[in-house]
Amino acid sequence: MRLLVLGSAAAEAVPGVFCRCRVCDTARREGGREIRSRTAYMLGDDIRVDFGHDAFWHTVRYGLDHTRLRHLLFTHSHGDHMDTPDLWYRKPGFCQVPDDAVLHIWGNEHVLRRGG
C-alpha cells in the first residue's frame, strides 16, 4: 500500500498568510518543496487521514479521485484536520458518486459529535 503525504504543516500552513518569519519568507522566495499545506495523508486510493482546509487543493495537486475513497479517519476535531463543510458536497445534488461508494468516517467522540 502506498503512503502519500499530502501536507505536513500545522494549522497556519507554510508560509503563513500573515507571517514574516525566516521560514515563511524562505518559503515565499523559494517556493516548491518549501510550500507546505496542512497535514493529511492518503493510504492507497481508498483511505484518507484528515480532511482539512486544503482538501480541495490536495485533490487537484495530486490528481486524487475521491469517488474511490471508502475510509476517512480524523485524527482529531480541529478545523485544520476536519473541514466538515466540504464533506457536505459529497451529497446528492452536489456531485455524482457510484451507488456503492459508501464512505466510512472514523474518529473519536469529539470528531463524531462535531461531524453530526
Regions found by a protein language model. Give the residues of each.
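Active-site environment of divalent metal-dependent phosphoester hydrolases
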Residues: 78-82, 113-114
